[in-house]
From Swiss-Prot:
One of its GO terms (cellular component) is extracellular region. PANTHER family: BETA-DEFENSIN 119. Residues 1-19 form the signal peptide. This is Beta-defensin 19. Its main location: secreted. The gene is Defb19. It is found in: Secreted.
Amino acid sequence: MRLALLLLAILVATELVVSGKNPILQCMGNRGFCRSSCKKSEQAYFYCRTFQMCCLQSYVRISLTGVDDNTNWSYEKHWPRIP
């Protein structure tokens, strides 16, 4: 009986250790995932802190120039003017 309890305790303890996953690191403001290789539907843009690629979905657009697109949303329209 003791042997069965000991085996059960070892089995449960090893299952908890083996089943634990590493948390997936996110990058680009939670738009991408840090992986060693990107999936077919993803593109690598730069590297994460873990020296893995930051993989983004193909539909995610990033402005590399830092210039905002020409939209109606602007800083002047967002904040009220102070007289």
